[in-house]
Amino acid sequence: MSAGGDFGNPLRKFKLVFLGEQSVAKTSLITRFRYDSFDNTYQAIIGIDFLSKTMYLEDGTIGLRLWDTAGQERLRSLIPRYIRDSAAAVVVYDITNVNSFQQTTKWIDDVRTEGGSDVIITLVGNKTDLADKRQVSIEEGERKAKGLNVTFIETRAKAGYNVKQLFRRVAAALPGMESTQDGSREDMSDIKLEKPQEQTVSEGGCSCYSPMSSSTLPQKPPYSFIDCSVNIGLNLFPSLITFCNSSLLPVSWR
């Protein structure tokens, strides 16, 4: 691991947006990567959720900002603004749901319309643990990815299969990280902060956490942006800036 990535240079930060239909397990993929855990009781996201993770690679250290989006049709109008300024997009489908696979074409088109041609796109077939219910073959996924000029991988968030491999591939393709190979040594450790005290959120307000007071974000998602928008500075000594003004939120979120 490059020492310069830790002390000599500012931490490179990249925005990754996760897209796909409802119930394809986008949140499960992010949670498996971020916490190495799986929860069968996730609720559908209403709007946008945000998590961050620091990856320590052989060629340096990078900060990933992971944006988890809602798949419901009624919330589709919120998504384009979060595609913008993304370095990479992960478009997920459920291998047991052929409609979710067919809809990936539209999601990829949205990425290229809103983010431009430089956004790195990965097509992900998730839930390979349900092989007996498979409706989309590996070959179909590979063929579609090739036709749309994106990368492809199948994953199983429930058991963690190929999840780290997915993020390694994305990291290797990010600007300035092209020399990072899939087989390079990697430490997925996170910046360690003390576990926060449990806090409650009252209606119309928000609960704010600051690493400066030995607290961090709760260890279990989702973190909703409906009540409170959080921007985390991913530096060696992270800081937290919290904006709790509901007037800044879109009308449809209030």
From Swiss-Prot:
It catalyses: GTP + H2O = GDP + phosphate + H(+). A motif (Switch 2) lies at residues 69-88. It comes from the Eukaryota. Keywords: GTP-binding, Hydrolase, Magnesium, Metal-binding, Nucleotide-binding. GTP binds at residues 23-28, 39-40, 42, 71, 126-127, 129, 157-158. A motif (Switch 1) lies at residues 32-50. GO terms for molecular function: GTP binding; GTPase activity. Gene3D superfamilies: P-loop containing nucleotide triphosphate hydrolases. GO terms for biological process: intra-Golgi vesicle-mediated transport; intracellular protein transport; protein localization to Golgi membrane; retrograde transport, endosome to Golgi; retrograde vesicle-mediated transport, Golgi to endoplasmic reticulum. One of its GO terms (cellular component) is nucleoplasm. Pfam families: Ras. Its EC number is 3.6.5.2. The keyword Nucleus does not apply. Mg(2+) binds at residues 27, 68. SUPFAM superfamilies: P-loop containing nucleoside triphosphate hydrolases (SSF52540). It is an enzyme of class 3 (hydrolase). The small GTPases Rab are key regulators of intracellular membrane trafficking, from the formation of transport vesicles to their fusion with membranes. Rabs cycle between an inactive GDP-bound form and an active GTP-bound form that is able to recruit to membranes different sets of downstream effectors directly responsible for vesicle formation, movement, tethering and fusion. Belongs to the small GTPase superfamily. Rab family. Switch 1, switch 2 and the interswitch regions are characteristic of Rab GTPases and mediate the interactions with Rab downstream effectors. The switch regions undergo conformational changes upon nucleotide binding which drives interaction with specific sets of effector proteins, with most effectors only binding to GTP-bound Rab. NCBIfam families: small_GTP (TIGR00231). This is Ras-related protein Rab-6D. It comes from Homo sapiens (Human). The gene is RAB6D.
